[in-house]
A protein has these predicted regions:
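Subset-of-secretome marker
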Residues: 2-6, 20-226
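Sec-dependent signal peptide hydrophobic core
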Residues: 5-13
Length: 226
């Protein structure tokens, strides 16, 4: 499921790809669509922290996420697919996951679910089953990957998203709209629509946040070794 979730999120972000502080216009509304996306990516990848949340639909299945990311530290939050919920944490090169009872029963069976109930599993964030978490918990990887390629873009001008002034950038090839703050720093604010219908929002840019590794995690490499 982790391997399916990331591509679905990236597709939505690429098809469309927080809040920018301040009230003075930053000039993004007058720029080309490609320049707005370039500026948004630069702003996002330079940020110290961000909160990413929302839901999309992949192959008819609802996917949701709520993740806090801290630059050069890691990230933590929750994700779910079709009611199967799990918590994730990445601290440096280590990743952790704790699944709901339903999640564990599906992927570990009844006996495994009973054994792992309420426990965190630990693995590598660079190789293995949990490697897919890395791009979702790394500001640079998330926004460079998501905003690094896209279809033909069109600047639809200034509008508002939930009361915030933004520039709407539409991907006329793949569908979807990226909203970028048109005042203050041009941070990505939200992604709406696209191939995978849904909305992803970005907020709490540069807020003070901390990521802590869970205690007593079970090393995944040792499961089933006996």
């Amino acid at each position: 499921m982790l391997r399916r979730f990331l591509p679905a999120l990236v597709v939505l972000m690429v098809a469309a790809a927080g809040c920018g502080g301040g009230s003075k216009s930053n000039g993004e509304a007058a720029k080309t669509a490609d320049q707005v996306v370039t500026d948004a990516k630069a702003a996002a990848t330079s940020a110290k922290a961000v909160h990413v949340s929302g839901s999309i639909t992949d192959a008819g299945q609802p996917l949701t996420l709520d993740i806090t990311i801290v630059k050069d530290a890691g990230g933590q939050g929750t994700m779910s697919e079709s009611g199967l919920k799990f918590e994730i944490i990445r601290v440096g090169s280590k990743a952790y996951i704790k699944g709901s009872d339903a999640f564990l029963r599906k992927f570990a069976g009844a006996a495994g679910a009973q054994l792992l109930k309420g426990k965190w599993l630990q693995g590598s964030a660079t190789t293995g089953d949990l490697a897919a978490l890395a791009p979702l918990t790394d500001i640079g990887k998330l926004f460079n990957g998501a905003l690094g390629s896209h279809g033909k873009l069109e600047n639809k001008g200034e509008t508002t998203f939930k009361g915030q002034k933004v520039v709407a950038i539409e991907d006329t090839t793949q569908g979807g709209t990226l909203y970028v703050a048109s005042t203050g720093t041009p941070y990505p604010v939200a992604i709406v629509g696209g191939k995978d219908q849904g909305t992803i929002t970005f907020d709490k840019w540069n807020d003070t946040m901390s990521i802590t590794a869970p205690k007593g995690a079970v090393d995944m490499s040792k499961l089933g070794s006996n």
